[in-house]
Amino acid sequence: MFSPQQPMRNYPQPGPPRPMPNQRMMGRRPPNMRGPSFGAQQQGFQQAGQFLPQANAGARNGAGAGGGLKGMLSRFLPGGGGAGSAGVPGIPGAGAAASGGAGLQGIQNIANPASLSSMLGNVQKVLGMAQQVTPMIQQYGPLVRNLPAMMKLYSQLSKSDDTETEANEESEKQSVSEESSEKEKETETKTSDGNKKSKPKSSSLPKKSKTTDNKEQELKTSAPKKKEAASPAPKRTSGSSKPRLYI
């Protein structure tokens, strides 16, 4: 509102007061002619302050109304909105007049055939885009809706595959363990059979030796008995001879 204060360069020198040029020309005032009092000046300032806020409020209201209409028209029309939307500050009602002018300009722009043709062209473009997009939505809409269910199915299938692989691995491990246990059993049976076969052979040898020893003892005992039975000792008689036959 007020310009910045400038520093005072030419300071007045102290001395007796000098008469003003008007006082030189006109002389002193008559005693009846006095300046306005301080109270009257204060009342004038108060009235001016009351008038200025009212003017500013009217200008703001006018600018707000014009801006709202301008914004609405600029959305629908290219280059819409009046040029004189801003009100004149200090004059009440100027904003309302500017907004009315903006509304009239917007109506004129709507009635303009060029603006109507541009609006129709934009509407046709929007309809064409909608016609192109609707079949794609009809085709891919169910897929998009079923995406969560498809994801669930995929996760379940992956889990089932994992469980199947785990079951196969467990069955393979069990089969390997069973085969190893069977092999161990077979080796144990073979070793036990070999031990059984080796034991009778070793036991048969001493039996044979025992039988041979028994036979030898029997032969030894039977041989002297035969000799005793075969050759009885003859009884000799003194003074007697036996005839011998010579052939």
From Swiss-Prot:
Residue stretches of biased makeup (Low complexity): 1-12, 21-43
Bias (Basic and acidic residues) occurs at 170-196, 210-229
Q: Where is this region: Disordered?
A: 1-43, 157-247
Cite the InterPro entries for this sequence: YqfQ (IPR025571)
What name is this protein filed under?
Answer: Uncharacterized protein YqfQ
